[in-house]
Amino acid sequence: GKSYFSKIAGEVENPQSAGALLRSPFEFAQHGQSGMWVSEVMPHFAQCVDEVVMIRSMFTTSITHEPALFNIHSGRLFPGHPSLGAWVSYGLGSESQSLPAYVVLEDSKGPPINRNQNWQSGYLPPVCQGTRFRSTGAPVLDLHPGKDVPDQMIDLERDLIGELDRIHLGRRPHQPSLGARIANYELAARMQIEASEALDLSKESLATKAMYGIGEDKTDSYGRRCLIARRLVERGVRFVQLFIDGQIWDNHTSLKSGLQGAC
Protein backbone atom coordinates (compact mmCIF):
# COMPACT_ATOMS: atom_id res chain seq x y z
CA GLY A 1 0.00 0.00 0.00
CA LYS A 2 0.92 3.66 -0.25
CA SER A 3 3.27 5.04 2.39
CA TYR A 4 1.15 6.11 5.36
CA PHE A 5 3.87 8.42 6.65
CA SER A 6 4.12 10.25 3.34
CA LYS A 7 0.39 10.60 2.71
CA ILE A 8 -1.61 10.93 5.92
CA ALA A 9 0.39 10.87 9.14
CA GLY A 10 2.80 13.78 8.89
CA GLU A 11 5.92 13.78 11.07
CA VAL A 12 6.29 10.80 13.37
CA GLU A 13 8.97 9.66 15.71
CA ASN A 14 10.88 6.56 14.67
CA PRO A 15 11.28 4.27 17.72
CA GLN A 16 14.15 2.47 15.98
CA SER A 17 16.37 5.55 15.83
CA ALA A 18 16.50 6.71 19.46
CA GLY A 19 14.18 9.66 18.98
CA ALA A 20 15.42 10.94 15.61
CA LEU A 21 12.68 12.30 13.33
CA LEU A 22 11.85 10.52 10.09
CA ARG A 23 10.44 13.32 7.98
CA SER A 24 8.33 12.90 4.86
CA PRO A 25 9.53 14.72 1.72
CA PHE A 26 6.07 16.31 1.41
CA GLU A 27 4.43 19.18 3.26
CA PHE A 28 1.29 18.54 5.32
CA ALA A 29 -1.77 20.60 6.23
CA GLN A 30 -5.01 20.01 8.10
CA HIS A 31 -8.21 19.79 6.06
CA GLY A 32 -11.96 19.67 6.61
CA GLN A 33 -13.89 19.98 9.84
CA SER A 34 -12.12 16.87 11.08
CA GLY A 35 -8.75 18.58 10.77
CA MET A 36 -7.23 15.52 9.12
CA TRP A 37 -3.58 15.88 8.18
CA VAL A 38 -3.04 15.22 4.46
CA SER A 39 0.10 15.74 2.41
CA GLU A 40 0.41 17.96 -0.64
CA VAL A 41 0.61 14.92 -2.89
CA MET A 42 -3.15 14.28 -2.42
CA PRO A 43 -4.87 17.62 -3.11
CA HIS A 44 -8.15 16.12 -4.35
CA PHE A 45 -8.43 13.71 -1.42
CA ALA A 46 -7.84 16.65 0.93
CA GLN A 47 -11.05 18.27 -0.33
CA CYS A 48 -13.26 15.35 0.75
CA VAL A 49 -11.68 14.13 4.00
CA ASP A 50 -14.93 14.68 5.90
CA GLU A 51 -16.66 12.17 3.62
CA VAL A 52 -14.33 9.25 4.36
CA VAL A 53 -13.56 7.08 7.37
CA MET A 54 -9.88 6.98 8.28
CA ILE A 55 -8.83 3.80 10.09
CA ARG A 56 -5.53 4.33 11.92
CA SER A 57 -5.43 1.13 13.96
CA MET A 58 -4.52 -1.34 11.20
CA PHE A 59 -1.13 -3.03 11.17
CA THR A 60 0.54 -6.17 9.86
CA THR A 61 3.19 -8.45 11.26
CA SER A 62 4.48 -9.33 7.78
CA ILE A 63 6.84 -7.29 5.62
CA THR A 64 6.35 -9.22 2.36
CA HIS A 65 3.72 -8.69 -0.32
CA GLU A 66 1.95 -12.05 -0.41
CA PRO A 67 1.17 -12.44 3.33
CA ALA A 68 0.29 -8.75 3.57
CA LEU A 69 -2.29 -9.10 0.79
CA PHE A 70 -3.76 -12.19 2.42
CA ASN A 71 -3.90 -10.25 5.68
CA ILE A 72 -5.73 -7.24 4.30
CA HIS A 73 -8.26 -9.42 2.47
CA SER A 74 -8.97 -12.07 5.09
CA GLY A 75 -7.29 -10.94 8.31
CA ARG A 76 -4.93 -13.93 8.11
CA LEU A 77 -1.37 -14.21 6.81
CA PHE A 78 -1.95 -17.42 4.87
CA PRO A 79 -4.37 -18.51 2.09
CA GLY A 80 -7.41 -20.65 2.72
CA HIS A 81 -9.54 -18.16 4.65
CA PRO A 82 -12.55 -16.25 3.27
CA SER A 83 -11.94 -12.75 1.95
CA LEU A 84 -14.00 -9.81 3.18
CA GLY A 85 -16.04 -9.81 -0.02
CA ALA A 86 -16.78 -13.52 0.41
CA TRP A 87 -18.08 -12.88 3.93
CA VAL A 88 -20.34 -10.09 2.64
CA SER A 89 -21.58 -12.37 -0.13
CA TYR A 90 -22.20 -15.18 2.37
CA GLY A 91 -24.01 -12.96 4.87
CA LEU A 92 -26.06 -10.75 2.56
CA GLY A 93 -26.30 -12.60 -0.74
CA SER A 94 -27.04 -10.59 -3.87
CA GLU A 95 -29.91 -8.22 -4.52
CA SER A 96 -29.70 -9.15 -8.20
CA GLN A 97 -30.63 -12.47 -9.78
CA SER A 98 -28.54 -11.63 -12.83
CA LEU A 99 -25.27 -10.43 -11.28
CA PRO A 100 -22.89 -11.94 -8.70
CA ALA A 101 -22.86 -10.69 -5.13
CA TYR A 102 -19.09 -10.15 -5.24
CA VAL A 103 -17.34 -8.67 -8.29
CA VAL A 104 -13.64 -8.01 -8.83
CA LEU A 105 -12.39 -5.38 -11.31
CA GLU A 106 -8.74 -5.95 -12.15
CA ASP A 107 -6.30 -3.49 -13.67
CA SER A 108 -5.89 -3.94 -17.41
CA LYS A 109 -2.11 -4.06 -16.93
CA GLY A 110 -2.32 -7.38 -15.13
CA PRO A 111 -3.56 -9.24 -12.05
CA PRO A 112 -2.40 -8.44 -8.50
CA ILE A 113 0.02 -10.53 -6.48
CA ASN A 114 -1.70 -13.74 -5.28
CA ARG A 115 -4.12 -13.39 -8.18
CA ASN A 116 -7.52 -15.01 -7.49
CA GLN A 117 -6.46 -16.09 -4.01
CA ASN A 118 -7.19 -12.50 -2.98
CA TRP A 119 -10.92 -12.99 -3.51
CA GLN A 120 -11.26 -16.63 -2.53
CA SER A 121 -14.13 -17.98 -0.42
CA GLY A 122 -11.95 -20.22 1.77
CA TYR A 123 -14.10 -22.57 3.83
CA LEU A 124 -17.31 -20.74 2.84
CA PRO A 125 -19.34 -22.09 -0.11
CA PRO A 126 -17.43 -21.59 -3.39
CA VAL A 127 -20.31 -19.52 -4.76
CA CYS A 128 -19.24 -16.75 -2.35
CA GLN A 129 -15.90 -16.11 -4.06
CA GLY A 130 -15.39 -13.06 -6.25
CA THR A 131 -16.31 -13.05 -9.93
CA ARG A 132 -13.72 -11.31 -12.09
CA PHE A 133 -15.00 -8.72 -14.57
CA ARG A 134 -12.99 -6.95 -17.23
CA SER A 135 -13.53 -3.19 -17.45
CA THR A 136 -13.07 -3.07 -21.24
CA GLY A 137 -14.42 -5.30 -23.97
CA ALA A 138 -16.49 -8.30 -22.96
CA PRO A 139 -16.94 -8.17 -19.15
CA VAL A 140 -16.65 -11.94 -18.83
CA LEU A 141 -14.79 -13.98 -21.43
CA ASP A 142 -16.73 -16.64 -23.37
CA LEU A 143 -20.02 -15.44 -21.89
CA HIS A 144 -21.84 -15.19 -25.22
CA PRO A 145 -22.31 -18.04 -27.74
CA GLY A 146 -21.28 -17.77 -31.37
CA LYS A 147 -23.26 -15.39 -33.57
CA ASP A 148 -24.32 -18.21 -35.90
CA VAL A 149 -26.11 -20.18 -33.17
CA PRO A 150 -29.92 -19.59 -33.18
CA ASP A 151 -31.52 -18.48 -29.90
CA GLN A 152 -33.85 -21.49 -29.91
CA MET A 153 -30.88 -23.84 -30.16
CA ILE A 154 -29.17 -22.04 -27.27
CA ASP A 155 -32.25 -22.47 -25.07
CA LEU A 156 -32.53 -26.19 -25.88
CA GLU A 157 -28.84 -26.73 -25.22
CA ARG A 158 -29.06 -24.87 -21.91
CA ASP A 159 -32.05 -26.95 -20.78
CA LEU A 160 -30.26 -30.19 -21.69
CA ILE A 161 -27.08 -29.20 -19.85
CA GLY A 162 -29.14 -28.16 -16.84
CA GLU A 163 -30.84 -31.55 -16.69
CA LEU A 164 -27.51 -33.38 -17.00
CA ASP A 165 -26.08 -31.17 -14.25
CA ARG A 166 -28.94 -32.04 -11.90
CA ILE A 167 -28.42 -35.76 -12.52
CA HIS A 168 -24.67 -35.42 -12.00
CA LEU A 169 -25.15 -33.44 -8.78
CA GLY A 170 -27.71 -35.93 -7.46
CA ARG A 171 -25.10 -38.67 -7.66
CA ARG A 172 -22.54 -36.53 -5.80
CA PRO A 173 -24.46 -34.78 -2.99
CA HIS A 174 -21.37 -34.11 -0.87
CA GLN A 175 -19.45 -31.99 -3.36
CA PRO A 176 -20.29 -28.31 -2.68
CA SER A 177 -17.89 -27.13 -5.38
CA LEU A 178 -19.97 -28.97 -7.99
CA GLY A 179 -23.15 -27.21 -6.91
CA ALA A 180 -21.34 -23.87 -6.96
CA ARG A 181 -20.05 -24.54 -10.46
CA ILE A 182 -23.56 -25.32 -11.70
CA ALA A 183 -24.89 -22.16 -10.04
CA ASN A 184 -22.16 -20.14 -11.74
CA TYR A 185 -23.14 -21.51 -15.16
CA GLU A 186 -26.78 -20.63 -14.51
CA LEU A 187 -25.76 -17.16 -13.37
CA ALA A 188 -23.61 -16.74 -16.48
CA ALA A 189 -26.67 -17.32 -18.65
CA ARG A 190 -28.56 -14.57 -16.82
CA MET A 191 -25.53 -12.27 -16.94
CA GLN A 192 -25.39 -12.18 -20.73
CA ILE A 193 -27.57 -9.08 -20.87
CA GLU A 194 -27.23 -7.59 -17.39
CA ALA A 195 -23.43 -7.58 -17.18
CA SER A 196 -22.97 -5.96 -20.57
CA GLU A 197 -25.49 -3.26 -19.70
CA ALA A 198 -23.85 -2.54 -16.34
CA LEU A 199 -20.45 -2.03 -17.98
CA ASP A 200 -21.78 0.13 -20.81
CA LEU A 201 -20.79 3.71 -19.96
CA SER A 202 -22.11 5.23 -23.19
CA LYS A 203 -25.29 6.48 -21.50
CA GLU A 204 -23.41 8.28 -18.72
CA SER A 205 -23.26 12.05 -19.13
CA LEU A 206 -20.05 13.84 -20.08
CA ALA A 207 -20.16 15.62 -16.72
CA THR A 208 -20.25 12.31 -14.85
CA LYS A 209 -17.38 10.91 -16.90
CA ALA A 210 -15.35 14.04 -16.24
CA MET A 211 -15.91 13.67 -12.48
CA TYR A 212 -14.38 10.19 -12.67
CA GLY A 213 -11.41 11.33 -14.78
CA ILE A 214 -12.53 9.37 -17.83
CA GLY A 215 -10.80 10.67 -20.93
CA GLU A 216 -7.67 11.77 -19.08
CA ASP A 217 -4.56 9.70 -19.76
CA LYS A 218 -3.53 9.19 -16.13
CA THR A 219 -6.99 8.57 -14.67
CA ASP A 220 -9.04 6.99 -17.47
CA SER A 221 -8.47 3.32 -16.62
CA TYR A 222 -9.09 3.57 -12.89
CA GLY A 223 -11.86 6.12 -13.36
CA ARG A 224 -13.75 3.73 -15.64
CA ARG A 225 -13.54 0.99 -13.05
CA CYS A 226 -14.77 3.35 -10.32
CA LEU A 227 -17.79 4.31 -12.41
CA ILE A 228 -18.44 0.67 -13.32
CA ALA A 229 -18.27 -0.22 -9.62
CA ARG A 230 -20.93 2.39 -8.86
CA ARG A 231 -23.16 1.04 -11.63
CA LEU A 232 -22.75 -2.52 -10.35
CA VAL A 233 -23.70 -1.50 -6.81
CA GLU A 234 -26.73 0.36 -8.16
CA ARG A 235 -27.80 -2.91 -9.80
CA GLY A 236 -27.61 -5.00 -6.66
CA VAL A 237 -23.99 -6.18 -6.40
CA ARG A 238 -23.10 -6.24 -2.70
CA PHE A 239 -19.31 -5.97 -2.86
CA VAL A 240 -17.11 -4.59 -5.64
CA GLN A 241 -13.34 -4.63 -5.34
CA LEU A 242 -11.01 -2.57 -7.54
CA PHE A 243 -7.37 -3.45 -8.04
CA ILE A 244 -4.72 -1.06 -9.31
CA ASP A 245 -1.55 -1.69 -11.30
CA GLY A 246 0.59 -4.37 -9.61
CA GLN A 247 3.06 -2.74 -7.24
CA ILE A 248 2.52 0.94 -7.95
CA TRP A 249 3.05 1.82 -4.25
CA ASP A 250 6.17 -0.32 -3.82
CA ASN A 251 8.52 2.67 -3.50
CA HIS A 252 11.80 1.19 -2.28
CA THR A 253 13.67 4.04 -3.96
CA SER A 254 12.78 7.45 -5.42
CA LEU A 255 10.01 7.88 -2.87
CA LYS A 256 9.12 11.43 -3.82
CA SER A 257 8.91 11.00 -7.59
CA GLY A 258 7.39 7.52 -7.26
CA LEU A 259 4.52 8.65 -5.06
CA GLN A 260 3.86 11.76 -7.10
CA GLY A 261 3.65 9.66 -10.25
CA ALA A 262 1.34 7.13 -8.63
CA CYS A 263 -1.02 9.78 -7.31
Predicted features and spans:
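Ligand-binding pockets and gating/stacking loops
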Residues: 1-263
